[in-house]
Every structure is written in structure tokens, then in C-alpha cells.
């Protein structure tokens, strides 16, 4: 009985969560290239295009957004995928002469971006 238990515990110690595999450098790079122009480096809607979209870019470090992130951990990824404001993001970029090359998002990219942004948001005051 001890050997199977030891084997199970050994196997469990090798299993890591998706967060353990997240590439924070990739997440930061994706954010810097694709999000910071509106949300700013600090995620507080301080980017040069933050007030040029309608509605204005939200501050992602507010208590309300932190609660939303806690209640729905996929909110960041779903915002990228679903673009709840229709074509607001591409329209804002186009109207301001910003060209962002197309990006074929991978599962790893979403994981990395989510992990990076969540970390910055949860550390902010």
C-alpha cells in the first residue's frame, strides 16, 4: 500500500498547473505590442489612445475590475477573443493611424497574456 501511495504522490508532484507553464516574457511582450497603446504600461488606461476610444479605455486596476477578474478569471481572454464592443479596438487603432499586424493567437499566448495581466492587476493598489 505504501508503494502505490508514494507513486501517486510522486506523480502529483510532477503535475504543474497551467500558470506554472506561463511565459511571463511572452505575456508582457504581447501586452506591450497589442494592449499598452490604450491600457498603458500600468493597465490604468494611461496609454496614448486611452481617451480616443468611445467609450474610453477602462482602468483595469480598479476594485470593480479586480472583483470581476476574481469572479470570472477568463475575463481578460474573453475580452480579446470576443471584443464585446464589436469592432471598437480595430476602429480606434485605424482612426488613429496605428497599424497592429495580425496575430494568430495560440492557447499559450492567451495563457501568457492572462497570467501577465492578472499579475499586474492583482499587485496594483
Locate the predicted segments by residue.
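Short, non-ligating residues that shape and space the ligands of small metal-coordination modules
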Residues: 44-45
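Short, solvent-exposed mixed-charge patches
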Residues: 123-125
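Sec-dependent signal peptide recognition
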Residues: 1-8
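Electrostatic cytochrome c docking/interface patches
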Residues: 13-30
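The canonical Cys-X-X-Cys-His
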Residues: 27, 31-41, 113-117
